[in-house]
């Protein structure tokens, strides 16, 4: 089960049907990706919710202007085909307008942070 793909699909589908919140399974990876989306201003808030023994993350979506109201998320590295990049060849999403979320040896971070720290890693997804 690919929890990152589930997270991306849930957020994408919620934007399509104008939902305000998205509930996904709480994993450390999903929490870190959510933290990055929150820092970069793509979502409004994140909170954790426990339902019995299961934990969920609840994302409150942020809508932009009426014309351009949804963000685009694209899964890059998949379980069947991992995509890695070293820091000099780290891709710039839309010429720097978007971000790449990268899993490195020092945790999950944006492409900008990875370039500053001069480390490469697995490119999880693009967000713009």
UniProtKB/Swiss-Prot annotation:
Transmembrane segments: none annotated. One of its GO terms (cellular component) is ribosome. Keywords: Chloroplast, Plastid, Ribonucleoprotein, Ribosomal protein, RNA-binding, rRNA-binding. Pfam families: Ribosomal_S8. Disulfide bonds: none annotated. GO terms for molecular function: rRNA binding; structural constituent of ribosome. It comes from the Eukaryota. One of its GO terms (biological process) is translation. It is found in: Plastid, Chloroplast. Its main location: plastid. Part of the 30S ribosomal subunit. One of the primary rRNA binding proteins, it binds directly to 16S rRNA central domain where it helps coordinate assembly of the platform of the 30S subunit. Belongs to the universal ribosomal protein uS8 family. This is Small ribosomal subunit protein uS8c. It comes from Welwitschia mirabilis.
